[in-house]
Amino acid sequence: MPTIQQLIRTEREKARQKTKSPALKQCPQRRGVCTRVYTTTPKKPNSALRKVARVRLTSGFEVTAYIPGIGHNLQEHSVVMIRGGRVKDLPGVRYHIIRGTLDTAGVKDRKQGRSKYGTKRPKEAKK
């Protein structure tokens, strides 16, 4: 416990909050280039083949980002936009690729939650 005199001399240091997405450098999104697109398996007790990509960002970081939705058109050298947001059952995956921007196509035949997957509104069927 410091004395009052010690506190006058040097005030207490504020506890700094550590960011959960350092590669974004305080920006909401970042652009990057895919260096590798592959599938990986989640932690126990889940089982699947999750689609992920290794992305080199304009901020200089190389991160692993999750590709949401069913099916994708990404390959090496695709230019993508990433946002923060981890995938709970994939250790080390702290970013999501934004569908429907740059080289990433939206999810085909998506009817609900379209804005999250970059899908345009479907044309109404003519009667």
Curated annotation (Swiss-Prot):
The annotated region (Disordered) lies at 8-28, 102-127
Coiled-coil segments: none
Question: What does the record list as GO biological process?
Answer: translation
InterPro entries registered for this protein in UniProt: NA-bd_OB-fold, Ribosomal_uS12, Ribosomal_uS12_bac
Source domain of life: Bacteria
Residue spans with biased composition (Basic residues)? 113-127
Q: Summarize the protein's role.
A: With S4 and S5 plays an important role in translational accuracy. Interacts with and stabilizes bases of the 16S rRNA that are involved in tRNA selection in the A site and with the mRNA backbone. Located at the interface of the 30S and 50S subunits, it traverses the body of the 30S subunit contacting proteins on the other side and probably holding the rRNA structure together. The combined cluster of proteins S8, S12 and S17 appears to hold together the shoulder and platform of the 30S subunit.
How is the subunit organization of this protein annotated in UniProt?
Part of the 30S ribosomal subunit. Contacts proteins S8 and S17. May interact with IF1 in the 30S initiation complex.
* Full protein name: Small ribosomal subunit protein uS12
Give the originating organism: Nostoc sp. (strain PCC 7120 / SAG 25.82 / UTEX 2576)
Give me the gene this protein comes from.
rpsL
